[in-house]
Curated annotation (Swiss-Prot):
The gene is ais. The lineage of its organism: Bacteria, Pseudomonadati, Pseudomonadota, Gammaproteobacteria, Enterobacterales. Catalyzes the dephosphorylation of heptose(II) of the outer membrane lipopolysaccharide core. InterPro entries: His_PPase_superfam, LipoPS_heptP_Pase. This is Lipopolysaccharide core heptose(II)-phosphate phosphatase. Residues 1-35 form the signal peptide. It is an enzyme of class 3 (hydrolase).
């Protein structure tokens, strides 16, 4: 009888071990893939589902800047390239297929204004110079935009140092965004939470 009990316990422990391993594997291959930088990847479908529960904030880095590229400028050399404008328009088309209910903001630079304009497909744009200043005060600035938007979703075109700061501050990860890369946050009970990196598709 004792031998049977010991064998049962041993088998049960083995089963528990297998079950635990399966849970881990399932978690890694489920809804959220993970970027190499340690941030969860948020695709359009996941973003749309999140937006049904909370007001979401999507912060994009501007498109390819002209003064750091050999590509043709869209207009002013302090703005973006033609290639960057086309990429912003394509991104906006895909984004708007998943999220339609949002207010659009940008910092007060030519490159962010142009990026947001080409992304927007005619949506009105509000320029806010505070989206250029990125430090601990960025969260209060974002919350102000949410209040102005009456808790609608918010899309902001800003700068790489803003995204880098938020990723480090909220998740402790090093995030070096390329042009038009983005972070997804949501607001709940007056606080902002970083959900991950937006990955179109």
């Amino acid at each position: 009888m004792l031998a049977f009990i010991l064998r049962f316990i041993k088998n049960k422990s083995y089963f528990a071990l297998l079950a635990g391993a399966w849970v881990i594997i399932a978690g890694l291959t489920s809804q959220h893939a993970w970027s190499g930088n340690g941030l969860p990847q948020i695709n359009g479908n996941t973003l749309a589902a999140l937006a049904k529960q909370y007001p979401v904030v999507v912060l994009f880095r501007h498109a390819e800047r002209c003064d750091r590229s050999d590509n043709t400028c869209l207009s002013d050399s302090s703005g973006i390239t033609v290639n960057g404008a086309q990429n912003a328009r394509s991104l906006g088309k895909d984004f708007n297929a998943d999220i339609q209910n949002y207010n659009l903001y940008s910092s007060n630079t030519v490159r962010t204004i142009q990026s947001a304009t080409w992304f927007s497909a005619g949506r009105s744009l509000t320029v806010d110079k505070k989206m250029m200043d990125c430090g601990s005060g960025i969260y209060a600035s974002i919350n102000t935009l949410l209040k102005k938007s009456q808790n609608k979703n918010v899309v902001i075109f800003t700068h790489n140092h803003c995204l880098t700061y938020i990723a480090k501050n909220k998740r402790g990860v090093k995030f070096e965004p390329d042009y038009l890369d983005a972070l997804v946050m949501h607001a709940a009970n007056g606080k902002l939470f970083l959900d991950g990196e937006f990955v179109p598709g």
